[in-house]
Amino acid sequence: MEPGPALAWLLLLSLLADCLKAAQSRDFTVKDIIYLHPSTTPYPGGFKCFTCEKAADNYECNRWAPDIYCPRETRYCYTQHTMEVTGNSISVTKRCVPLEECLSTGCRDSEHEGHKVCTSCCEGNICNLPLPRNETDATFATTSPINQTNGHPRCMSVIVSCLWLWLGLML
């Protein structure tokens, strides 16, 4: 057999395998996000979140999420996932939020038809890709301390203590 037809079959099978793999995937990957993140931001520390209101599932939410920056007064990406007891999605809501809306993450059973509602928050650019499905996923993930206080008083006390120690050694 000549190498030409065999190579053509190999390429055709490879293309078919890629098409089948793409057709089966109904979720976004981190690789997809690379195309959503431009190199400039409208303000220092600007970030984006997937945003949608009551989408049917995670795919529909992430697929149609507007590609815009979060308002300056927000800092976190919020996700609320309502699902059946079987785990099938009923609705997905994602948005940019301030700290106050992230203080009650976790899962709870809804009194409405036995549904489960899981809520999560995260800090970072487009960090709300996955859905919270259980207590392990329904967390508040932050990359910086929530209680950020001005560190100068502590630094000053350390500096003064070091100066006193140094002066004591010099005398």
Curated annotation (Swiss-Prot):
<keyword id="KW-0336">GPI-anchor</keyword>
<dbReference type="GO" id="GO:0005886">
    <property type="term" value="C:plasma membrane"/>
</dbReference>
<protein>
    <recommendedName>
        <fullName>Ly6/PLAUR domain-containing protein 6</fullName>
    </recommendedName>
</protein>
<feature type="propeptide" description="Removed in mature form">
    <location>
        <begin position="148"/>
        <end position="171"/>
    </location>
</feature>
<comment type="function">
    <text>Acts as a modulator of nicotinic acetylcholine receptors (nAChRs) function in the brain. Inhibits nicotine-induced Ca(2+) influx through nAChRs. In vitro, specifically inhibits alpha-3:beta-4 and alpha-7 nAChR currents in an allosteric manner. Acts as a positive regulator of Wnt/beta-catenin signaling.</text>
</comment>
<keyword id="KW-1015">Disulfide bond</keyword>
<feature type="lipid moiety-binding region" description="GPI-anchor amidated asparagine">
    <location>
        <position position="147"/>
    </location>
</feature>
<feature type="disulfide bond">
    <location>
        <begin position="122"/>
        <end position="127"/>
    </location>
</feature>
<keyword id="KW-0732">Signal</keyword>
<keyword id="KW-0325">Glycoprotein</keyword>
<keyword id="KW-0964">Secreted</keyword>
<keyword id="KW-0966">Cell projection</keyword>
<keyword id="KW-1003">Cell membrane</keyword>
<keyword id="KW-0771">Synaptosome</keyword>
<feature type="domain" description="UPAR/Ly6">
    <location>
        <begin position="47"/>
        <end position="141"/>
    </location>
</feature>
<keyword id="KW-0472">Membrane</keyword>
<feature type="disulfide bond">
    <location>
        <begin position="49"/>
        <end position="77"/>
    </location>
</feature>
<feature type="disulfide bond">
    <location>
        <begin position="102"/>
        <end position="121"/>
    </location>
</feature>
<dbReference type="GO" id="GO:0043204">
    <property type="term" value="C:perikaryon"/>
</dbReference>
<dbReference type="GO" id="GO:0045202">
    <property type="term" value="C:synapse"/>
</dbReference>
<dbReference type="GO" id="GO:0005576">
    <property type="term" value="C:extracellular region"/>
</dbReference>
<keyword id="KW-0770">Synapse</keyword>
<feature type="short sequence motif" description="NxI motif">
    <location>
        <begin position="88"/>
        <end position="90"/>
    </location>
</feature>
<dbReference type="GO" id="GO:0098552">
    <property type="term" value="C:side of membrane"/>
</dbReference>
<feature type="glycosylation site" description="N-linked (GlcNAc...) asparagine">
    <location>
        <position position="147"/>
    </location>
</feature>
<keyword id="KW-0449">Lipoprotein</keyword>
<feature type="disulfide bond">
    <location>
        <begin position="107"/>
        <end position="118"/>
    </location>
</feature>
<feature type="disulfide bond">
    <location>
        <begin position="70"/>
        <end position="96"/>
    </location>
</feature>
<keyword id="KW-0963">Cytoplasm</keyword>
<dbReference type="InterPro" id="IPR039457">
    <property type="entry name" value="LYPD6-like"/>
</dbReference>
<dbReference type="Pfam" id="PF16975">
    <property type="entry name" value="UPAR_LY6_2"/>
</dbReference>
<dbReference type="GO" id="GO:0045121">
    <property type="term" value="C:membrane raft"/>
</dbReference>
<dbReference type="InterPro" id="IPR045860">
    <property type="entry name" value="Snake_toxin-like_sf"/>
</dbReference>
<feature type="disulfide bond">
    <location>
        <begin position="52"/>
        <end position="61"/>
    </location>
</feature>
<comment type="subunit">
    <text>Interacts with nicotinic acetylcholine receptors (nAChRs) including CHRNA3, CHRNA4, CHRNA5, CHRNA6, CHRNA7, CHRNB2 and CHRNB4. Interacts (via NxI motif) with LRP6.</text>
</comment>
<dbReference type="GO" id="GO:0090263">
    <property type="term" value="P:positive regulation of canonical Wnt signaling pathway"/>
</dbReference>
<dbReference type="GO" id="GO:0005737">
    <property type="term" value="C:cytoplasm"/>
</dbReference>
<feature type="signal peptide">
    <location>
        <begin position="1"/>
        <end position="22"/>
    </location>
</feature>
<dbReference type="GO" id="GO:0030550">
    <property type="term" value="F:acetylcholine receptor inhibitor activity"/>
</dbReference>
<feature type="glycosylation site" description="N-linked (GlcNAc...) asparagine">
    <location>
        <position position="134"/>
    </location>
</feature>
<dbReference type="GO" id="GO:0030425">
    <property type="term" value="C:dendrite"/>
</dbReference>
